[in-house]
């Protein structure tokens, strides 16, 4: 049977699975997660993951027949291609790999289009995809809601309880709340303890979640197409609170894979071409209603734009204020750049 190495590239690093080309839904023969170092380029963890997996396969006398990598932008694709040199690596647009895996597993509903809600450590990407043509109708990205933002809020919540935690520890506690309802954190220096519950996390993230629901509605209004489902992707989608909250706010059927952060890596296995250095891009459809409002209908307008700016400013100010009110001694000194204000970027349909 043919062994394929599937890799997904993201802001937090790379995830890779080694599996048979016709069995990406089963437990992989091997998997690895390579975090991205502070300041490192996106291609570094990707190549590290590929090297580790290939070396491990050789040690087991296994032959990797192909390698495919997902990317979110053309800039990342070009960087990975340049760093890989002569290596035969297929590069695939991430939404295409996600759709292919969902269709393969039967999770993709029989509908004209779906919303891909991909929430990772650095932000939220919302893509309205046409299921009949595997094309992008519209895509937008927001950094108002992110895994890193969640971690900052958890860290602040622990500091209020007298527990000093670094970013990695805060993330571990936040991720633990996807499985447990209550997490007890301990300060290794003082012995102090603080309890964080799922309800605490839901309260901290409520404003960002409401913003993301508005974000989804804005994307669907631009295309003029009603999606048949909301597909939750990315590691943050493991949170039961997030899934329940979005179901109530958006009112669409929820599609969820038990390992949402590995959907891209598994899906790209199905798209490996076995051709030298293939590049699989997702086409973009020209949707008339996405370029201009329908007759008699106004576009998003100034009110919605102002509302989005207000939410962004409020969330940014809230986090900054919360962190600023803490005694500086409650926070460990760490390297790296200071967090930047929340930004909204748009990937328009041409």
Annotate the PLM regions:
Residues 1-24, 106-136, 175-182:
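Gly/Thr-rich phosphate-binding beta-strand-loop-beta motif of the actin/hexokinase/Hsp70
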Residues 1-70, 75-79:
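Conserved phosphate-binding loops in N-terminal lobes of ATP-dependent enzymes
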Residues 39-52, 186-226:
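Adenine-nucleotide phosphate-binding core of ATP-dependent small-molecule kinases
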Residues 56-86, 173-174, 185-189, 194, ...:
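Short beta-strand-loop/turn "lid" adjacent to the catalytic site in phosphate-handling enzymes
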Residues 67-76, 220-247:
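Glycine-rich phosphate-binding loops at beta-strand->alpha-helix junctions
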Residues 78, 83-164, 197, 210, ...:
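Small-residue (GG/TT-enriched) beta-loop-alpha framework at ligand/catalytic clefts
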Residues 94-105, 150-151, 255-311:
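Glycine-rich phosphate-binding/hydrolytic loop that grips phosphoryl groups
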Residues 130-206, 238, 244, 307-321:
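Phosphate-binding glycine-rich/basic clefts of nucleotide- and phosphate-handling proteins
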